[in-house]
Structure formats: structure tokens, C-alpha cells
Amino acid sequence: MFMQTKHIAQATVKVLQSYLTYQAVLRIQSELGETNPPQAIWLNQYLASHSIQNGETFLTELLDENKELVLRILAVREDIAESVLDFLPGMTRNSLAESNIAHRRHLLERLTRTVAEVDNFPSETSNGESNNNDSPPS
């Protein structure tokens, strides 16, 4: 169980690290659009031909092309991480709890509706007549 939990945590860190890299690139891309349009154009072209899905691979490949930009991405990524990581544990727990409650409520509503529909469905007796217990016997 511990190894599985550790593996999940490591995979989560990798995804989060890539996402922070992506957010840093977006921030820099926006800044460059205002301060250095030629560099912004270069970055846009680079992004069009290189996947940022894996942040670490992206940075390794970019290192061969533009070391300054990599250093800037690293600094911005670290800054973003510093500003959000303290909030993540509590926000994640709360968000998951709220999501789970909403999904359980939706499931319960569906089950209740299904049971109500089954209860309202007219049953038939063995001779093909509707079984109506509300009418008086003849």
C-alpha cells in the first residue's frame, strides 16, 4: 500500500511540475508579447513545433535553443510554485470532498428517480390485466 501511495505521489508531482512549467511559459509568452515581440514570435513558433506535455523534456530540449529563456522559465515556475503550493493540500481536499458529495447526490437522485419510475410502472397479472389495487372488488 505504501509503495502504491508513493508511486501516486511521484506521478502527481510530475504532472504538477509539468503544469507549473506550462503556466510559467504562458506567463512569459504574455510578458514577451508586450516587452519583446520578436522573442514572443520565436517562442510561439517553438511552442508550435515542440510539445510542452512533459515539462522536463520541454525544458531539456529548449536548453539547446535558448538558455536564457530556460532560466527565465525556471525562475517563473519557482515563483508560481511558491505562491500556490501552500494552498494545494487544503484546496485539493475540499475540492475532492465537494466533488464527491455532488456526484453521490447525483447518483442518489438517479437511483431515487429510477426506483420511483419502477414503482409507478403498472404491473400486470398473469391473465394480462392490469393489477389495480385501488379499485374496489366487483
Swiss-Prot record:
A GO molecular-function descriptor: protein folding chaperone
GO cellular component: carboxysome; cytoplasm
Source organism, top-level taxon: Bacteria
Record's keyword terms, sorted: Bacterial microcompartment, Carbon dioxide fixation, Carboxysome, Chaperone, Cytoplasm, Photosynthesis
Keyword Chaperone recorded: yes
Name of a matching Pfam family: RbcX
Region (Disordered): 118-138
GO biological process: carbon fixation; photosynthesis; ribulose bisphosphate carboxylase complex assembly
Listed Polar residues bias regions: 122-138
InterPro entries noted in UniProt: Chaperonin_RbcX_sf, Chaperonin_RcbX, RbcX
Subunit structure: Homodimer. Interacts with the exposed C-terminal peptide of RbcL via its central cleft, contacts a second RbcL monomer via its peripheral polar surface.
Domain remarks: The homodimer has 2 functional domains, a central cleft essential for production of soluble RbcL in which the RbcL peptide binds, and a polar surface which plays a role in correct RbcL subunit arrangement.
Protein name according to UniProt: RuBisCO chaperone RbcX
Organism whose genome encodes this protein: Synechocystis sp. (strain ATCC 27184 / PCC 6803 / Kazusa)
Primary gene name: rbcX
